[in-house]
Design a protein with these regions (language model features):
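Phosphate- and other anionic-substrate recognition elements at nucleic-acid/protein interfaces
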Residues: 1-122
């Protein structure tokens, strides 16, 4: 596990250096079926937060229900619905794999909520 966390950290740093984002969006930890899975997810989130902090990036967190609602229109959508809607929203040629769809869903959620709040500020 330490090697995978290091690989994640180094990969995130490369992405941050290349893409130069202003902020980072991540999913809040959902403690569901397995405490072990939640612990591993928490460790990965910690690495993402650390890499973001190193570059002074604001980290915004969204709950799974917020993400699903932003992508599908309802907070209790299933994974298949999220994957399909990501394909539609982003005009992809095929449905992305589960992990990629999850990451893209967080990005879509963040983008939608940012656009909404920007309009409210005007």
């Amino acid at each position: 596990m330490p090697e995978r966390l290091l690989e994640l950290y180094q990969g995130l740093k490369k992405v941050i250096q290349r893409a130069r984002p202003n902020e980072v969006a991540i999913e809040k930890v959902f403690v569901g079926a397995s405490a072990q899975s939640a612990l591993k997810l928490g460790q990965a989130r910690g690495v993402a937060i650390l890499a973001s902090a190193e570059y002074n990036l604001e980290v915004l967190e969204y709950s799974p229900n917020q993400i699903k609602k932003a992508v599908v229109g309802r907070g209790h959508a299933d994974k298949t619905q999220v994957m399909f809607m990501i394909k539609v929203i982003l005009s992809l040629s095929e449905v992305p794999e589960s992990d990629a769809a999850d990451a893209l869903a967080v990005a879509v959620c963040h983008s939608n909520l940012n656009l909404s709040s920007s309009k409210l500020e005007r």
